């Protein structure tokens, strides 16, 4: 393939003696990456005009997301003969110091330099789908080819389609969008499904993420769109698909732009279109921008959206591999899965299956949040446990507090207690504990979190996002939310817990689609593992975390108040008086809205 043969030429291109790259992911841009980039360009131009830089000068570049969103804007400096240095939380006013101290003076600007834990964090990951995040320009096909991009496709085009499918089966790859179905067997079903006289068969990328805590697919598509495109072409050749569609949300503007750019570049290199790589295989891809709805990510609803219909889920079977888009066999995997396919073809199925455990091979990208020191996107071997991620990679629970609850799987996931922290992050291990991997986000919370409050958010989100087609979701979720409101506001009864559990179990087995089935996991696992906390809300009318403010009237213990005034400023209604000049604070409950701001502000536990 001519496009891949340019790798050696690309490697030899002069990129300047010193190279500076800036993270231009969505979070990076939100933190001011464009301003930082412009400041670098401006300062480099001035330094070059004054002959202050070396003869090689500096080259500028952009890179995609590497997952460390809390550290943006990230800047990497590559000086020949030295280890690369990453700078974090860079602002425009730091640019001149980085240039003068590091590039001209030869000394790292330590104030902004990433600490050792940043590098250790990366070493503890196994990055496959995120391999090129932070390393290459996502808008430059030559940089992707330079690191081995499209070599997996080159290898695939020299194989029989059926052999590619067997290779994917041997790798142990499973879908990374929730259910974890074995990818190779899904491909085989699509490849063997009867077609029309024209052999019409579709292949798709599910790049839609409705879970508010999940952004893995967006980051993969933004950070290395060619990796997704290459995987999709390989899959298309394996099942002999006639057309490819990348379905993503219209509000993923950066991902959409970069995907379209990648498709254009691939066509120009002969990697898409007629007779790909000199073979008789012809195939093309287009991007479909869908609506911003949680239900839009469900496979049958997604296909209905592409067909121009309202995105309602359909009962299965028949499955989409037999009768999908416009009634034709359709293969659908998410963006992370397609990015992994290209790596497997390039490095081999044995390489991929060497990672993971007996339940699941390979790796998974997780979106991490909560009361942990480091959050963002990280990719781990499937055998990694919650405890290893929280303590070894994420720096443990912040502010030296204790882990109380792990919320795994986002709004369709569930809760686990600290005693389950040694559970591996694979499909079966999670399922055995009553939670699903779902869209692979997990949050670790300390004792300031309330399980009932967290469950209210999950159920409330799912209630708002339900398509309303089936009664279990449309009516059941509202009933559950009302019961949770009663418990959190002092109207709950002990018998409500059994009613809640029974109702959730009914929805779990009768909902039309997978999203409905999992919409109640937060309540089921909450009652299973944190029943005592539910009972304290009902019997004692107390919330240990003081999150369920409907249970409380706030009182200042005068003997503990030091009159520091810390509680006055955060009060949004001016309900607090005193608190200064040795006069204890006082809360006017007629003005208090139970927002909990004063409780959180008091360092002396004087507000109860």
Locate each region found by the language model.
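Ferredoxin-type iron-sulfur electron-transfer modules in oxidoreductases and energy-metabolism complexes
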Residues: 2-18, 33-60, 75-106, 151-170, ...
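Flexible inter-domain linker/hinge segments
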Residues: 110-170, 333-348
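Gly-rich Lys/Arg/Thr-decorated short loops/hinges at beta-loop-alpha junctions or inter-strand turns
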Residues: 136-138, 144-151, 206-217, 320-325, ...
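Accessory "access/gating" subregions that flank catalytic or transport cores
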Residues: 154-197, 353-354, 359, 367, ...
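Histidine-anchored nucleotide/phosphate-binding helix
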Residues: 224-238
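Short amphipathic, charge-patterned alpha-helical segments
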Residues: 231-233, 382-398
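Hydrophobic alpha-helical positions that pack around
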Residues: 256-382, 394
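C-terminal accessory/binding modules appended to enzymatic or scaffolding proteins
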Residues: 360-374, 386, 544-582, 586-589, ...
């Amino acid at each position: 393939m001519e496009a891949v043969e340019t790798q050696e030429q690309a490697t030899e291109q002069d990129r300047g003696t010193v190279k500076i790259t800036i993270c231009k992911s969505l979070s990076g841009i939100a933190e001011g990456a464009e301003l930082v980039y412009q400041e670098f360009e401006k300062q480099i131009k001035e330094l070059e005009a004054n002959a202050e830089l070396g003869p090689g000068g500096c080259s500028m570049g952009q890179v995609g997301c590497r997952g460390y969103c809390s550290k943006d804007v990230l800047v990497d400096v590559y000086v020949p003969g030295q280890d690369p240095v990453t700078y974090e939380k860079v602002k425009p006013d730091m640019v001149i110091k980085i240039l003068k101290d590091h590039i001209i003076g030869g000394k790292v600007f330590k104030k902004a330099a990433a600490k050792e834990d940043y590098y250790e964090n990366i070493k503890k990951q196994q990055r496959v789908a995120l391999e090129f995040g932070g390393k290459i320009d996502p808008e430059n096909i030559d940089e992707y080819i330079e690191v081995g991009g499209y070599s997996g496709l080159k290898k695939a085009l020299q194989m029989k389609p059926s052999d590619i499918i067997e290779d994917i089966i041997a790798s142990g790859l499973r879908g990374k969008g929730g259910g974890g179905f074995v990818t190779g067997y899904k491909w085989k079903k699509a490849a063997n499904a009867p077609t029309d006289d024209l052999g019409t068969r579709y292949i798709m990328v599910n790049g839609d993420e409705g879970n508010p805590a999940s952004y893995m697919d967006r980051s993969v598509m933004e950070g290395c769109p060619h990796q997704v495109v290459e995987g999709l072409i390989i899959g298309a050749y394996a099942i002999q698909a006639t057309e490819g569609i990348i379905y993503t949300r219209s509000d993923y503007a950066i991902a959409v732009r970069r995907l379209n750019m990648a498709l254009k570049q691939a066509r120009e290199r002969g990697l898409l279109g007629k007779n790909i790589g000199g073979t008789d295989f012809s195939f093309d891809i287009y991007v479909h921008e869908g609506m911003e709805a949680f239900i839009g990510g469900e496979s049958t609803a997604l296909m209905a959206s592409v067909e121009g219909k309202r995105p309602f889920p359909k009962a299965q079977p028949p499955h989409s591999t037999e009768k999908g888009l416009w009634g034709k066999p359709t293969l659908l995997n998410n963006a992370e899965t397609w990015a992994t396919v290209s790596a497997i073809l390039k490095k081999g199925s044995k390489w991929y299956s060497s990672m993971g455990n007996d339940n699941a091979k390979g790796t998974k990208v997780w979106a991490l949040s909560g009361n942990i020191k480091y959050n963002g996107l990280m990719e781990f071997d499937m055998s990694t446990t919650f405890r290893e991620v929280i303590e070894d990679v994420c720096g443990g629970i912040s502010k030296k507090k204790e882990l109380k609850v792990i919320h795994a799987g986002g709004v369709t996931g569930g809760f686990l207690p600290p005693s389950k922290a040694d559970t591996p992050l694979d499909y079966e291990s999670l399922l055995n504990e009553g939670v699903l991997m779902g869209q692979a986000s997990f949050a670790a919370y300390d004792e300031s979190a309330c399980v009932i409050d967290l469950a209210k958010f999950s159920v409330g989100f799912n209630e708002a996002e339900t398509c309303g087609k089936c009664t279990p979701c449309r009516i059941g979720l509202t009933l559950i939310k009302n019961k949770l409101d009663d418990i959190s506001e002092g109207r709950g009864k002990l018998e409500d817990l059994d009613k809640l559990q029974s109702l959730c179990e009914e929805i779990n087995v009768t909902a039309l689609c997978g999203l409905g089935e999992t919409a109640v996991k937060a309540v089921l696992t909450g009652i299973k593992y944190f029943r005592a906390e539910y009972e304290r809300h009902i019997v004692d009318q107390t919330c240990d975390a003081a999150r369920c403010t409907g249970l409380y009237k706030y009182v200042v213990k005068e003997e503990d108040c030091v009159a520091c005034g810390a509680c006055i400023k955060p009060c949004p209604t001016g309900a607090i008086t005193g608190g200064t000049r040795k006069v204890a604070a006082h809360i006017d409950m007629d003005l208090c809205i139970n927002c909990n701001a004063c409780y959180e502000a008091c360092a002396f536990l004087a507000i109860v």
